Amino acid sequence: LAKDTRKLFDPKDDAVLTYLDDDGRSIEPEFYMPTLPTVLVNGTEGIGTGFSCYVPPFNPEDIKQNIVNHINNKPFKPMKPWFRGFKGRVFEDEGGGWVTEGIWQVIGTTVKVSELPPGRWTQDYKEYLDTLVEKKLIGSFTNNSTTEDVDFLIQGYSGKDIIKDLKLQKTIRSTNMHLFHPSKGICKYQSAEEILSDFIGLRLEYYKKRKDQLIW
């Protein structure tokens, strides 16, 4: 385990978790109860029986501040998706979704791309640019990217819509956030703030269980 894992999964919760049984042997808990909702910190994506889910990651500092706001009877501040190390923009579109946008610079017919939207990898992007060379939408390109930085120099671009042609934006929809709640079952959430609200309610239940255990 990473050294900070036990800050997220407090040892004081161990005694109040419900542990599963495997042939008379106690194994892992039915679910863990972290101090921050890891589904919002890490994001998640998957397909289950009859349901699919996509939740983007959010900034742990924003999540923490909204928990403090709740404790102080203040409203949540809207949170936007956040990707560690991403240097581009994240903004809300007119349909209520989110758009991630890379970074580029245009000099005549040359385009320097120094950041791609999250989830768009440099190898895949290189292969995509190869198809644009075949279509004669660009003349050539050089890939100087490293494991740390994106660096594509695209020459001879002749298109009309640089963002669409060079795939410099990616849309994130928040209409498919299906998650399993321990007492409610499968729930469809409309926002990250709604997920956080349910988490806080459950987290408070477990603080109460810890308190009751100390008393009794």
Predicted regions and their residues:
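Charged, surface-exposed alpha-helical interface/stalk elements
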Residues: 73-216
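A short, contiguous, amphipathic alpha-helix enriched in charged residues
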Residues: 1-27, 113-137
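Long insertion/accessory domains within large nucleic-acid-processing enzymes
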Residues: 18, 22-56, 61, 65-68, ...
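Generic, well-ordered alpha-helical scaffold segments in large soluble proteins
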Residues: 3-8, 39, 54, 63-70, ...
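Short beta-strand elements
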Residues: 5, 37-42, 97-106
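Active-site-proximal segment of RNA-dependent polymerases
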Residues: 12-39, 76-98
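Conserved glycine-bearing catalytic or ligand-binding loops at nucleotide- and phosphate-handling centers
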Residues: 1-4, 47-100
